[in-house]
A protein has these predicted regions:
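Secretory targeting and sorting signals
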Residues: 1-14
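Hydrophobic alpha-helical membrane segments, chiefly transmembrane helices and signal peptide h-regions
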Residues: 3-6, 107, 200-203
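Active-site catalytic motif of lipid deacylating hydrolases and related acyltransferases
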Residues: 16-92, 172-199, 203, 208-217
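Structural motif
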Residues: 21, 136-139, 169-170
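Active-site-adjacent alpha-helix of alpha/beta-hydrolase-fold enzymes
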Residues: 43-47, 152-168, 172-174
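Serine-dependent carboxylesterase/thioesterase catalytic core
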Residues: 74-163
Length: 220
């Protein structure tokens, strides 16, 4: 079964605390790290942060064709997010993912257990609601559509961004990309998010969310 939006126990976080922590899950078959789309996004975001410090955490999971192992990514990402929220409460967290990694990040934001789905081992329930206060923005690139998920993993639940994250999520899909768009028919389009400016668009969206969050806290 594909990963579900449930979490394990938080792990320890290193000090000192950065201003911004990006937690990004790479796409299928990309080598460990954040992947090509992730790196383009991270670089574009860094250039928009001025003097703010930023750390990047590549989600640790197989990113293989076995979508059941995406659960490993949900567990790893949720552990990291909860750890940062607990030990670095002033750090603004940015979630992101490309392709299968966008599924991982999307499931992480879900409100509840999808009806009829069994939780994989190591997942205990949705992330605590107060964790969402520490997440400034979410950037999803080429998130698998429900139809695509059913084609490759028919036990996979649909990916629904939870209400606590919806207003701070940018979900980007190239219309020709068949992974995320039911009408898409050009498989090459799936790898064009950096080339067509969508990683820059997402970086600006996230930078604006980070700025507005900081301004709101300062005013408060």
């Amino acid at each position: 079964m594909l990963a579900n939006p449930f979490v394990g126990m938080p792990a320890a976080s290193a000090e000192p605390c950065p201003d911004v922590e990006v937690v990004f899950a790479r796409g299928t078959f990309e080598p460990p790290g954040v992947g090509g789309t992730g790196q383009a996004f991270v670089d574009a975001l860094q250039s928009r942060l001025g003097g703010k410090s930023m750390e990047v955490y590549p989600v640790n999971y197989p990113a293989s064709l076995d979508f059941q192992t995406a659960a490993n990514g949900v567990i790893d990402a949720s552990n990291k997010v909860q750890s940062v929220a607990a030990t670095c409460p002033d750090t603004k967290i940015v979630l992101g993912g490309f392709s299968q990694g966008a599924a991982v990040a999307g499931y992480l934001t879900a409100d509840s257990v999808p009806a009829g789905y069994q939780m994989p081992a190591g997942l205990t329930g949705p992330m605590p609601a107060d964790v969402a206060d520490h997440v400034a923005a979410v950037a999803l690139f080429g998130k698998p559509s429900t139809g695509f998920l059913q084609m490759i993993a028919n036990t996979a639940p649909p990916i629904t961004v939870g209400h606590l994250y919806a207003d701070k999520t940018q979900d980007l899909c190239i219309p020709e990309d068949p992974i995320c768009s039911p009408a898409g028919s050009d498989s090459n389009a799936h790898n064009l998010y950096p080339a067509n400016g969508l990683t820059d668009r997402a970086a600006q969206f996230v930078a604006d969310k980070l700025e507005s969050t900081t301004a709101t806290e300062t005013a408060g």
